[in-house]
Every structure is written in C-alpha cells, then in structure tokens.
Curated annotation (Swiss-Prot):
It comes from the Bacteria. InterPro entries: AMP-bd_C, AMP-bd_C_sf, AMP-binding_CS, AMP-dep_synth/lig_dom, ANL_N_sf, CaiC. It catalyses: 4-(trimethylamino)butanoate + ATP + CoA = 4-(trimethylamino)butanoyl-CoA + AMP + diphosphate; crotonobetaine + ATP + CoA = crotonobetainyl-CoA + AMP + diphosphate; (R)-carnitine + ATP + CoA = (R)-carnitinyl-CoA + AMP + diphosphate. This is Crotonobetaine/carnitine--CoA ligase. It comes from Shigella flexneri. PANTHER family: ACYL-COA SYNTHETASE (PTHR43201), MEDIUM-CHAIN ACYL-COA LIGASE ACSF2, MITOCHONDRIAL (PTHR43201:SF5). Keywords: Ligase. Belongs to the ATP-dependent AMP-binding enzyme family. One of its GO terms (biological process) is carnitine metabolic process. NCBIfam families: PRK08008.1. The gene is caiC. It holds the Pfam family AMP-binding. Catalyzes the transfer of CoA to carnitine, generating the initial carnitinyl-CoA needed for the CaiB reaction cycle. Also has activity toward crotonobetaine and gamma-butyrobetaine. Its EC number is 6.2.1.48.
C-alpha cells in the first residue's frame, strides 16, 4: 500500500503553507523561557531561506550536513531546508563529547556543521586537525568568533529570499537523513532514512494517536532523536496541528507548559514519569487538556496506575526503534488496551516471534520480536556504508530482527520481555533485567534502578543492582535483599548492590549499561 505517492518533503511544506497559511505550526520554548512562534507560512519561508543559505555555501543534492543543536527553531529550519534541496541531515546527539562527535563526522562524511557557541570549541579543534571532511561551521548564536571557515547562521539566513532558489529533482526514495543510533552497547550505526520514511512516519503517527489539525502536540524529547522527529514533529505537521518543542525537560515546569500551550498530546519515557511522580502534589495536577500520552518502555503496573490516577491521563503504548522509524507495535486509536502489552502490529506491518533458528513461534512462547516492512519506506533503508551490519538485522524480504525478546497472545497482542543483550544467564536460568527492575522500582525508597550481569566463575553471571534513592532516604543492604527475596524467585535475587547519585543515560533516557559493567 502506497500512501505517499510522489510527495517528498519539499512538496509537503509547499502544500502545508498553502493549506494552513497563518495557522500556528511551531512553538519553541528555550530553557530561558524565550518563546518563538511560526505559522505554517512563516515556517515554510524560514525553511526556504535556510535552504538558500546552504546552497550559497556550496551544499548540493546528496551532500551531508551535521547538526549539533539542542531543541531550537534552527533545528527545524535546517532539517527541512536541507531536504528541500536534496541534501542530507546528520543530527548529532547534543550530549556527545568530542571523540564521539568526531567519529560521527568522519563516518557520515559531513562537510558542513550547524552548531551553537557552547559546542564550538571542540569543533574548532576538529576542524583545525583536518581529520574529517568538515570544511565550514555555521553558528546559530549572535556572538561569532573571528575564525576562518565560520559563519553566522542567522545573519546568512536573513539575507536570503523567502522563496526557494534551487530546486533539484527529488524522489521519495532519496535519502533525507542519516541518524546514528544511540550506541548503548556498541559504536553507533548510521540509519539511512528516506523522504518516504519521513512522510510515512507523519501519516502513521498521526493515525496512531488520532491527531487532528486542532491538536497541540508538545514534546520535550530531543530533536536529534527519532521519537521527536517521527512520532511528534512529522505527525503534527502532517495533520496540520501545532507542534510545541521545549528545549529541555523539567519535571517542575512540565505541567505548567502543558497547560500554557493547551497541549492535547505529549510523549513520555519512564524517567519522566518517575520524576514527575516525585514532585509535590498540586491542585493543578489535572488542570490540562492532554488526551493521550505516548509512552515508551518500560514501567511497572504499579507505577503506571499511580501516574494515570494522579494526573488523570492515559498512556498510549508505542514500541519501536530508530530502524523501524515509528512505533510499529502499539495501542491503536479507539481500540482496547491490554497492559502490560505493547499493543498490536500497526497498519503496513507484520510482526512475529521467532526462535534462535529464525522459525515463527506460537502464542505464549518467548523469542525475538521480528517486524516485516518495506526498506526505505516503512522501515529504514540500510546502515550507511555498512552492508554487513545491515544484512545481520534485515532480511531480503523485509523482515527486521529487533534484538528484543517478547511473546504474543492469541489475539495478537505483543509483550516485551527485554533486549537480548540484557538477558542475564545465571546458573542455566535466563533472567530479564527489565523484570527485576520493575519489581525493585516498587520499593518506596528507590527512585531509579538498573540491574546488570557481571562475570561469575560459578554461575556464568551474577546480578548487580544499581539504585538511586529518593531524596533524604537511606537503604541498608539487609533491607534491600530482604525486599528482593520477598518479591522474586531466589535465582533472580541480586548478589550485589551499589547505591549511586545517578545513573548514566543517553538522550532518550535509556540506561547506558556498558558504563556500569
């Protein structure tokens, strides 16, 4: 089923400007409280100016341009401005340091970078060492160092006309973006995303939460992440809704922002839900218009019930990853929801549970979650310049191996168990890290938790728990292990406990387990 036709991203924005004109398209709130608003017409003009800026700097179809930015209007301008001239965006996680950022520059072949003053010093060194193809840097800040190969993004953009000057032939099969995976277990891989992928993501995600043009979709997820781009931004724009992009998440400010912008849809990860729950109760907890909270793994039933009861919301579960572009398994609009199920396969997808020999398993049996889509259309096209890694996860007929374990029931509802790499082998038993974390998270003194497997000469692996306590709390090893023994099988009880002030997380809130082993 082809629901895109020939509508690439350039055509999308020209159409949106014509149809929605002066309707608010984008609201950006900075960490300092500065708010910028753009209508669909104004946003398309800013995108055109940005496309013209890149063209004047020598960027042509197929060239790669890296963005190292926090959530800001310039990210949106660049994303679609590059797409309009057939160039390719390479977003870089704004939390990455020099070595990681340089690695992405080298492996993406980016020749130009858009960033801000806070990140400039490390890129200045990278540019001077000449170890990458980077030849020019645009800074979004007003203050500009007097260095060769550095320009003011805003100054150059404002000099450009509001109509597009360079419009090469485009196809929906053209690459729009190379998004490097978070790399929680290994070096990140460049996920190739096409114009078709992004257009499909918009329609699909809008369907998933029944988005209308009078909706307001607010997100605090980072713009360099697939969730913000494909579940939130593309959905909102495709439906003609208003997209609210908040620069950084604050548990104290979140509900006030939802009220101020009259948000009807938002998205949350477990870290957000847990930090929102530890805020002091307020009479304004339910003073919002949210009808759906898009939710991504993983939360215990007790935590879910407490959150929904306190804030008067319901969670719409969505399961996916960078390679699937969208939440390919999830709750459906107006359909029943079956917690803790992650939902059912969405339209245009097939889903199966397979064993270690790649054979489909019946209902109730645990195996790998596999998804069938169309590469370059409903799932990613390939890993950039990495055919070996592509072949490892993507079969010729479109079946994608997720690396996640789960099972399904007789009605087609799927249940997530864990990442395969997060299964601990203990004395012949398979132990799910997620299962243990959900149990331990119910302890009233514990705010955050992760368990990992560590080498054990007798039992293959031992289990170690890292916990963050609620403010002012203390927890003895005796109390912790007694709680575990009362709530889980003996072979699942951790052998070690470490109390920490925080846990290492990536941009999407996922624990970076390799930093704890």
């Amino acid at each position: 089923m082809d629901i895109i036709g020939g509508q690439h991203l350039r055509q999308m924005w020209d159409d949106l400007a014509d149809v929605y004109g002066h309707k608010t398209a984008l609201i950006c709130e900075s960490s300092g409280g500065v708010v910028n608003r753009y209508s669909y017409l104004e946003l398309n003009q800013e995108i055109n100016r940005t496309a013209n800026l890149f063209y004047t700097l020598g960027i042509r179809k197929g060239n790669k341009v890296a963005l190292h930015l926090d959530n800001c209007p310039e990210f949106i301008f660049c994303w679609f401005g590059l797409a309009k001239i057939g160039a390719i965006m390479v977003p870089i996680n704004a939390r990455l340091l020099r070595e990681e950022s340089e690695w992405i520059l080298q492996n993406s072949q980016a020749c130009l970078l858009v960033t801000s003053a806070q990140f400039y010093p490390m890129y200045q060194q990278i540019q001077q060492e000449d170890a990458t193809q980077l030849r020019h840097i645009c800074l979004t800040d007003v203050a500009l160092p007097a260095d060769d190969g550095v320009s003011s993004f805003t100054q150059l953009k404002n000099q450009q006309p509001a109509t597009l000057c360079y419009a090469p032939p485009l196809s929906t099969d053209d690459t729009a973006e190379i998004l490097f995976t978070s790399g929680t277990t290994s070096r990140p891989k460049g996920v190739v995303i096409t114009h078709y992928n992004l257009r499909f993501a918009g329609y699909y995600s809008a369907w998933q939460c029944a988005l209308r043009d009078d909706d307001v979709y607010m997100t605090v997820m980072p713009a360099f992440h697939i969730d913000c781009q494909c579940t939130a931004a593309m959905a909102a724009f495709s439906a003609g809704a208003t997209f609210v992009l908040v620069e950084k998440y604050s548990a104290r400010a979140f509900w006030g922002q939802a009220q101020k912008y009259r948000a009807t849809i938002t998205e949350c990860i477990p870290m957000m839900i847990r930090t929102l729950m530890v805020q002091p109760p307020s009479a304004n907890d339910r003073q919002h218009r949210l009808r759906e909270v898009m939710f991504y793994l993983n939360l215990s039933e007790q935590e879910k019930d407490a959150f929904c009861e306190r804030f008067g919301v319901r969670l719409l579960t969505s399961y996916g990853m960078t390679e699937t572009i969208v939440g390919i398994i999830g709750d459906r609009p107006s359909d029943k929801r079956r917690w803790p199920s992650i939902g059912r396969a969405g339209f245009c997808y097939e889903a199966e549970i397979r064993d270690d020999h790649n054979r489909p398993l019946p209902a109730g049996e645990i195996g790998e979650i596999c998804i069938k889509g169309v590469p370059g259309k409903t799932i990613f096209k390939e890993y950039f310049l990495n055919p070996k890694a592509t072949a490892k996860v993507l079969e010729a007929d479109g079946w994608l191996h997720t690396g996640d374990t789960g099972y399904r029931d007789e009605e087609g509802f799927f249940y997530f168990v864990d990442r395969r790499c997060n299964m601990i082998k203990r004395g012949g038993e398979n132990v799910s890290c997620v299962e243990l974390e959900n149990i331990i998270a119910t302890h009233p003194k514990i705010q955050d938790i992760v368990v990992v497997g560590i080498k054990d000469s007798i039992r293959d692996e031992a289990i170690k728990a890292f916990v963050v306590l609620n403010e002012g709390e203390t927890l003895s090893e005796e109390e912790f292990f007694r709680f575990c023994e009362q709530n889980m099988a003996k072979f699942k009880v951790p052998s070690y406990l470490e109390i920490r002030k925080d846990l290492p997380r990536n941009c999407s809130g996922k624990i970076i387990r390799k930093n704890l082993k």
